[in-house]
């Protein structure tokens, strides 16, 4: 079967939820038995989001093969079974870098390099390559129609529609239909102007997804269809909902998947969304609730921890609990004290970089350890737990990470200078290495030690989890820390790197160097988060007055 392409654009304003809409449509098509993947094209000049500020861009989502990508790829993986890869996300920076590399190499035989055709051809090649072997590829273009940055991408997709044939392509445009309280009605003019903007660059949308805080009335949908040159059945009302996992059914109920299949002449069975119905049932019928404190450095923007937030909610679904997340700035722990941690059922310290707020995180780990509160540390959250234990239990009072103090006399955490990737290839790094794209990234095998809490939680001897770090436990000082009671419960495949630590005489204190949040989904959850949330409920029950 030839590959079919759905191109998703956004208009009027940003943050309308193109990624959620694209992922929801993909989940319906997948439920109809189609082989679907989703790509994200980002117009910014950064090569990838790996070195971008989390408070500006949100989290960096890491794929199985180690790509540092946009957080929308996390949405994609949470909605469909297909895993993302390096081919599923690329930026203007990556495209321009590749074109310039080819020019320096002489690939263009002395031609004058221009946006058209060289940049647009590179974009088209990557879209086609990323969609090979798929029935449907959904391609989301970041930004808003009218932005100068996205013009090369839109032009490339316009050309691609001509190249592969309009019968194999569909343009889906998300737009805002605002409700004006003083007028008591929704207004379609912004949508009309957004479509006009698309038409000016040669793109006629085939489907309009109309975002609003309420359902769009039938007469307004007819008006949009008339003025925007689309069939009325292709004007989809997408109102605000209490759960993003309700959107697949909302789109299906309006026949979007049927419209797509008719357009591409795909003969496939009706979508079975019973798994999503189960997710929504568990979400709507909890048997209790827990409050988990997330102590981080980027809490002013919750999207900086998007996958962690979602993984906690998924664990709530697994345990039939509502998970309330209390965000606490680790710097506030330094200035206001651990009183901010009172009343929590569990504590989670997520990943991060740099020294700011680290001492607050260390005090948080100490508070959780001493008060027997369930603790989950992720990446930096593991490293600070190790530092705390080394200082306050193992007698290494000057323990620190060389990331925070290069002259530290007791560096219990240091730069990884050499490791093996999943394929057995040796990677090396030094202090002089670039920051971008040089970390230990992607899926790595982890061996779990028998008799440990981690082994019990996972129920397996070997697991595969995704990493994103350049510092690790210093094995030279590890024996002294282990002698004081800390347990290493997970090691890398070559047994050289510490992956998980835990405290045996604590009800639930586990910290991992990897990022388990990247593989959690609403339908399946994740064993580590599920165990953590269950421990939070057990702690709550044992401390009831």
Swiss-Prot record:
Mg(2+) binds at residues 72, 140. It comes from the Bacteria. It is an enzyme of class 6 (ligase). Pfam families: CTP_synth_N (PF06418), GATase (PF00117). Allosterically activated by GTP, when glutamine is the substrate; GTP has no effect on the reaction when ammonia is the substrate. The allosteric effector GTP functions by stabilizing the protein conformation that binds the tetrahedral intermediate(s) formed during glutamine hydrolysis. Inhibited by the product CTP, via allosteric rather than competitive inhibition. The keyword Nucleotide-binding applies. PROSITE patterns: GATASE_TYPE_1 (PS51273). GO terms for cellular component: cytosol. GO terms for biological process: 'de novo' CTP biosynthetic process; pyrimidine nucleobase biosynthetic process. InterPro entries: Class_I_gatase-like, CTP_synthase, CTP_synthase_N, GATASE, GATase1_CTP_Synthase, P-loop_NTPase. Its EC number is 6.3.4.2. Gene3D superfamilies: 3.40.50.880, P-loop containing nucleotide triphosphate hydrolases. Catalyzes the ATP-dependent amination of UTP to CTP with either L-glutamine or ammonia as the source of nitrogen. Regulates intracellular CTP levels through interactions with the four ribonucleotide triphosphates. This is CTP synthase. It comes from Actinobacillus pleuropneumoniae serotype 3 (strain JL03). The lineage of its organism: Bacteria, Pseudomonadati, Pseudomonadota, Gammaproteobacteria, Pasteurellales.
